[in-house]
Design a protein with these regions (language model features):
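Structured-RNA-binding interfaces characteristic of tRNA pseudouridine synthases
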Residues: 2-275
């Protein structure tokens, strides 16, 4: 059998409630861990290799949901030639848990990097947070403060050595059937907890506990430490990741049907927790 390998780019979606985040961690269930398990069960990647070759484009924390994320994996070229993409997807999907969907797969070059994307799109369902009040038209003004290129230290859990400069391409209300359910934020890349800390700042402004001037100052003066808190992960969705040669296809259609706002008892859980 030939030792030649083919590198594949795949896309997945999942509900995050049952997972301790996307990346493999010891002794807990993760999305990446489930994917590796399935590929090993199928015999498509080695069970003995210490470092698996399956990587994901964007990390997500425990409880965060994903509409479209991506990743890469290397498999035998002989295997890839012997199976159609449709059968490949079905084989993987049949062994995955019901809350992970394997969406598509294609061949890419070995220099193709899933972590270098044109942009990532996140949406946060603000109405899920306890005591949320829709502030009306002023929400657009508040969200626009987060657009542009700036040091996002005050809106992230900054990891050592991580560049805090981020570019936010757009930040706007998320409206479904005339109802403002939250906001959408688009950027090239995000820092850890950046979207959830942005969500909590918006929530605090809506409650009147902080002012837009305080938020603007936190953006303009990253050297002065400010902590507005972090919103719960339950209402965060990685809506999509787009690459230059792989836009989000039309088949992953816009979701225009949403349940009513969550009941207060559901919304209350972990709302005001800080990290």
């Amino acid at each position: 059998m030939s030792n030649a390998e083919t590198r594949l780019h795949f896309r997945i979606g999942y509900l995050g409630d049952s997972y301790h985040g996307s990346q493999i961690q010891p002794d807990v269930v993760t999305v990446q861990g489930e994917l590796v398990r399935v590929f090993q069960t199928l015999g498509w990647i080695s069970k003995t290799e210490e470092e698996h070759n399956l990587v994901l484009s964007s990390r997500t924390d425990a409880g965060v949901h994903v509409r479209v994320n991506g990743g890469t994996v290397r498999i035998s070229s002989e295997l890839w030639k012997s199976i159609t993409p449709r059968k490949f997807i079905r084989a993987v999907d049949d062994l995955l848990p019901h809350d992970i969907a394997f969406l598509d797969v294609r061949e890419v070059g070995f220099d193709w990097n899933p972590r270098i994307a044109l942009h990532r799109v996140y949406r946060y369902r603000l109405e899920g947070i306890e005591f949320w009040k829709d502030p009306g038209e002023v929400l657009s003004e508040w969200l626009s403060m987060f657009e542009g290129t700036y040091n996002a230290t005050n809106f992230a859990r900054l990891e050592p050595g991580k560049n805090p400069i981020r570019t936010i391409l757009s930040c706007k209300p998320w409206i479904v059937e005339g109802r403002t359910v939250g906001f959408e934020i688009v950027g090239e890349a995000f820092l850890w907890n950046q979207v959830r800390r942005t969500a909590m700042a918006i929530h605090q402004m809506a409650l009147g506990e902080i002012t837009p001037e305080q938020v603007k100052s936190a953006i303009d003066h990253p050297d002065i430490s400010v902590d507005f808190g972090v919103a719960p992960p339950d209402w965060l969705i990685l809506w999509g990741v787009e690459w230059e040669d792989s836009p989000i296809p039309d088949s992953f259609s816009e979701c225009n049907h949403f349940s009513p706002p969550p009941l207060p008892s559901r919304a209350a859980e972990r709302t005001m927790r800080k990290r």
